[in-house]
């Protein structure tokens, strides 16, 4: 279910989703999440409200969401499928699923999801935004450059892994 758009990174997939949703007043994000998730929202001027998760990696409390509020849930390592299903039933289009660590998790009807294939494959970058849409999603208005992200692979081939390690680390931090 849903249509997808390929972008350059998981953070760009999240940005694409947030821009397509339109009037996003705030997003509730788990405390245990990648810093790039919060940085993406800050860059877009979207307020972030954090929530706690329990030892099962599930929200301690399920908030009531008002119009323009969204809940971002991280499908940790792809092991939280039942929780994603429960949240999708409760929140529908107000749920954004972060499947950056769950490449093989199916998209849910009516729910936006983001994926980061590079975390599962030998790819220097890559992201996928999935949204439930009646028609094809438009291409992103702007794209990141992929060349800087892939340069360390060529450096590794030509000069060895040791010499390319600093470039690889820079790619991971971007």
For the regions a language model picked out, list residue spans one by one.
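PLP-dependent aminotransferase-like
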Residues: 3, 12-90
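Generic low-polarity alpha-helical segments
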Residues: 14, 27, 97, 128-129, ...
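Short, Lys/Arg-enriched charge-dense amphipathic segments
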Residues: 28, 50, 122-127, 162-169
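Active-site phosphate-binding strand-loop segment of PLP-dependent enzymes
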Residues: 54-151
């Amino acid at each position: 279910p849903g249509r997808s758009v390929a972008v350059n990174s998981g953070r760009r997939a999240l940005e694409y989703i947030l821009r397509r949703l339109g009037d996003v007043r705030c997003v509730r994000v788990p405390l245990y999440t990648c810093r790039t998730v919060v940085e993406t929202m800050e860059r877009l001027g979207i307020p972030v409200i954090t929530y706690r998760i329990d030892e099962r990696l599930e929200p301690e409390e399920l908030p009531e969401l008002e119009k323009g509020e969204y809940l971002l849930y991280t499908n940790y390592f792809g092991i939280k499928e039942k929780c994603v299903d429960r949240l999708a039933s409760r929140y529908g289009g107000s749920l954004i699923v972060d499947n950056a660590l769950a490449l093989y998790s199916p998209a849910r009807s009516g729910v936006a999801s983001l994926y980061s294939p590079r975390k599962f494959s030998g790819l220097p970058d890559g992201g996928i935004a999935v949204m439930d849409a009646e028609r094809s999603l438009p291409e992103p208005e702007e794209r990141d450059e992929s060349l800087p992200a892939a340069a360390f692979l060529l450096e590794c081939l030509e000069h060895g892994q040791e010499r390319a390690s600093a470039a690889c680390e820079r790619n991971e931090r971007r």
